[in-house]
Regions:
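Interdomain motor-coupling "hinge/lid" segment immediately C-terminal to the ATP-binding subdomain
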Residues: 3-6, 12-14, 74, 78-81, ...
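Alpha-helix termination/capping residues and helix-transition junctions
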Residues: 2, 41-44, 256
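ASCE P-loop NTPase helicase motor core
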Residues: 20-97
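RNase H-like, metal-dependent nuclease domains and their acidic two-metal-ion catalytic environment used
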Residues: 6, 50, 56-61, 110-293, ...
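Short alpha-helix plus adjacent loop in nuclease-associated cores
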Residues: 81-86, 287-333
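Amphipathic alpha-helical transducer elements in NTP-driven molecular machines
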Residues: 29-32, 300-304, 344, 359-362
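Conserved RecA-like ASCE ATPase "motif II neighborhood" in helicase/translocase motors
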Residues: 1-31
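Switch/connector loops and helix/strand junctions flanking conserved nucleotide-binding motifs
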Residues: 16-19, 56-61, 80-82, 270-274, ...
Length: 435
């Protein structure tokens, strides 16, 4: 209209309908800049935003980066001030300095203590903390179910793994030296214990999510499985589509990890990428089975439905080198865009809203590989250990009955079950591996 103003008050510009996804928040933030062009150029001119944050990634935090001064006035005196980063309103801070106790009502004229108790009971704790305590640190705990803390991060052997690996969120297991790009308070944890014998993996695959040239990436994830526990060895990403150099480099990784199956999403290119891989496999003389998979479910639902149960059971082990590589990847990309390509950024921000994550190639390749092992995940690592010990005990009894002297010699040499069978000629392997 051409009007100008000395004081502009914008009330509740952020609501659930316009801030659910990253793209919607960026659009809303761009619209907010229009207010600055209407403001009169005076020293005392001001723009004031009033509202409650809807997500951890609220635009009010972005406005603070544009020299706006945020002031937070929760309904109760916070139990912990650290989540507010020193942004409590001066009037409320004065009440606290004068002896106001934690969880006291800050504005009795508006909300009584009983009223707030009823609201918290009806809304749920997380929603109450967001809408009334204005604490965004817990607001997306349920909305974003894929947490880095549910992963097991350690050095992964390329050829073998223990029978079982135990997760624990003890602070002593927190890996603070690794870079994290997840939600606030979300860290990586190392295993508490490795159990059982080390043996070769039951199966190893390479999951490929192909793409064309442009902003998307062609991603390869190398995954192994033993006793229902999955191990992510390495992840590779390329920005040149499905060129020969990209496909050959992926096959080099397959050779490194002794990959048995190449799993390729056929939605892109209608199977042409799989045919190109078969051509290169013939040239490199690699005996790898090529399988295609087609996704029919919406991407966000498919990724969460695949990864959430596996993470909740702590069945995904990630090599430390993957975390370092993810953080250092795409060094030439602008800092604000680099985050969008990082695997663990995509993982922690993935929710069921369409378009929640702008770039999801890496998390999609990982989920595709994990889904391949879905049926095998019903295997219990602890049950496999029990079965192996039972077989070992039965073999000892049989050995003791057959030849007592030989049995004693093998115990002295601390031979395992496979070595004892080879020594007695009861193994299919003609050449003993224990000599």
């Amino acid at each position: 209209t051409g009007s100008r103003a000395d004081l502009m008050i914008l009330d509740d510009v952020e609501v659930p309908g316009n801030s659910m996804t990253e793209m919607m928040r960026e659009k809303l933030l761009q619209l907010c800049t229009e207010a600055e062009s209407i403001l009169t150029p005076k020293e005392d001119s001001r723009i004031m935003y009033l509202g409650t944050p809807q997500t951890t990634f609220t635009i009010y935090k972005k406005l603070a980066e544009r020299s706006y001064r945020p002031l937070i006035w929760p309904a109760r005196v916070p139990r912990s001030m650290t989540n507010y980063e020193g942004l409590i309103a001066p009037q409320l801070q004065e009440q606290i300095d004068n002896g106001a106790k934690s969880w006291d009502v800050t504005d009795p004229d508006r909300f009584s203590d009983e009223d707030l108790i009823e609201r918290e009971a009806s809304m749920g704790r997380s929603n109450f903390m967001l809408q009334f305590m204005l604490d965004t640190s817990l607001s997306d705990a349920e909305k974003f179910p894929l947490k880095m803390a549910d992963l097991i991060v350690t050095s992964v052997n390329p050829k073998s793994a223990p029978e079982s690996i135990i997760w624990c969120s003890d602070p002593r297991n927190c890996i603070k030296e690794l870079p994290t790009v997840g939600l606030p308070g979300d860290y990586f944890y190392s295993p508490m214990q490795l159990q059982g014998n080390w043996d070769p993996y039951d199966d190893t695959i390479c999951s490929v999510d192909p793409s064309g040239r442009g902003s998307d990436e062609t991603v390869a994830a190398y995954l192994s499985q033993r006793n229902g526990i999955l191990y992510l060895h390495e992840m590779r990403a390329y920005r040149d589509g499905y060129s020969d150099s990209t496909l050959l480099d992926i096959l080099k990784g397959c050779k490194k990890y002794d990959t048995k199956t190449l799993l390729i999403e056929s939605n892109f290119g209608d199977g042409i990428v799989a045919e190109l891989f078969k051509k290169h496999l013939q040239q490199t003389k690699q005996a790898i089975n090529v399988e295609e998979t087609r996704a029919n479910v919406r991407k966000e639902d498919r990724i969460i439905d695949t990864l959430e149960p596996v993470l909740n059971q702590h069945r995904l082990v990630v090599d430390k080198s993957v975390v370092d590589w993810v953080y250092k990847s795409n060094p030439d990309t602008a800092p604000e865009k680099r985050l969008q390509y990082m695997l663990f950024y995509q993982m922690s921000r993935m929710c069921r809203e369409k378009g929640a994550v702008r770039h999801d190639d890496r998390i999609d390749a990982l989920a595709q590989g994990v889904k391949y092992f879905t049926d095998i995940l019903s295997i219990s690592a602890q049950q496999e250990i029990i079965n192996r010990k039972r077989q070992d005990w039965n073999d000892l009894l049989e050995h003791w009955e057959d030849d007592l002297d030989c049995f004693a010699d093998h115990l002295v040499f601390n031979m395992n079950m496979e070595q004892r069978k080879q020594a007695r000629g009861k193994d299919n392997n003609s050449v003993p591996t224990w000599v």
